Amino acid sequence: MNILQNLKESDPIISNLINSEKNRQETHLELIASENFASMAVMQAQGSVLTNKYAEGLPQKRYYGGCEFVDEIEELAIERAKQLFDADWANVQPHSGAQANAAVFLSLLKPGDTILGMDLSHGGHLTHGSPVNMSGKWFNAVHYGVDKETNKLNFNEIRDIALATKPKLIICGYSAYPRKIDFESFRRIADEVGAFLMADIAHIAGLVATKLHPNPIPYCDVVTTTTHKTLRGPRGGLILCKDKEFGKKFDKSVFPGTQGGPLEHIIAAKAVAFGEALKPNFVNYSKQVINNAKVLSSTLIKRGIDIVSGGTDNHIVLLDLRSINMTGKVADLLVSEVNITANKNTVPFDPESPFVTSGLRLGTAALTTRGFNDDAFVEVGEIIADRLLNPDDLLTEKKCKERVLTLCNRFPLYEVELEASIK
């Protein structure tokens, strides 16, 4: 076998499927809040010869030889992560956000300990104590939600739950909460009940890095995140701490506690993404992400579609479809038929099951990467509203699909052939 063959020659089936996915991304409006488009540089790092290197352990403390260059790469990723988030300690090895959270649990908790996180149906995450996840099986998980009137965090209610349940760990940071998080108020509650405080900023990491969202580092014992989403890096995880000595306990929980060898090609891609996020133009990008979300939210509200909490402070726009007598499952299908990619999502106090839902979650990070601006997002909002408010109108469906293609052609994704990035 010639290992120098390119993908098209060695496996045309996979090559064709990748090209089909590339075409889908280019010709659809990507509004899934947890997705973004990585740069060519990030993808080049992921597809590099670093894929071949095994490197158990930490830089300068490996169990294998030949790690001198991956040590430099990982050390650079660590330093850039610390600089980006004003942290004194970082571990860049977690394979995902879920793995980062698992490592924190292994360090701070024992089976049966009580953890307090947001209810999944209110915008929490599976790894914050859902009964279908190990976090809900190994620990006594209790939950808080949002206020029924405002759909925002109610710290008096959260405090009452914490005082009643005395959790060992309180988790803040969410997957479908569109408002700013008051980490200082969480810190006061954690101190009052003697709990550790963890922030999972997977969705808002890019906004935190650019100081457009409050930074949890000064208030939380530990912070976890993914490196894609608003940070626009490779799919992976990261753990951060303000206290360097406290942070060291998580090193052993990552390896050998929950993982084996790190993925050095992904760590290199993380380093590239952190470097990109440290540049001034990433601040401008993040500002536009938030502005686009506000424009999208206001456009939909004007068309009579309710938005959870009445708006957004980040990249997430969560539609409450009860306002138009529609389920999330139906809405997801309707927008997908005109080449808009989103996901059905529960809303607070949702009467529907998680398989049906009353909400549709949208995010602006990916399309902002393509260059979508205020005017473009007005059009995105109008297309979505036209489709949802006229579900049985075939002419509207046809016109919406044409308008989507016009936007995609106006804002091309990758203007050069992706194969060029790996030659």
From Swiss-Prot:
Disulfide bonds: none
Post-translational modification N6-(pyridoxal phosphate)lysine, affected residues: 229
Single GO MF descriptor: glycine hydroxymethyltransferase activity
InterPro entries to which the protein is assigned, alphabetical: PyrdxlP-dep_Trfase (IPR015424), PyrdxlP-dep_Trfase_major (IPR015421), PyrdxlP-dep_Trfase_small (IPR015422), Ser_HO-MeTrfase (IPR001085), Ser_HO-MeTrfase-like (IPR049943), Ser_HO-MeTrfase_PLP_BS (IPR019798), SHMT-like_dom (IPR039429)
GO cellular component: cytosol
Record's keyword terms, sorted: Amino-acid biosynthesis, Cytoplasm, One-carbon metabolism, Pyridoxal phosphate, Transferase
Compartment list: Cytoplasm
SUPFAM superfamilies, per database record: PLP-dependent transferases (SSF53383)
Biological role stated in the UniProt entry: Catalyzes the reversible interconversion of serine and glycine with tetrahydrofolate (THF) serving as the one-carbon carrier. This reaction serves as the major source of one-carbon groups required for the biosynthesis of purines, thymidylate, methionine, and other important biomolecules. Also exhibits THF-independent aldolase activity toward beta-hydroxyamino acids, producing glycine and aldehydes, via a retro-aldol mechanism.
Protein name, as recorded: Serine hydroxymethyltransferase
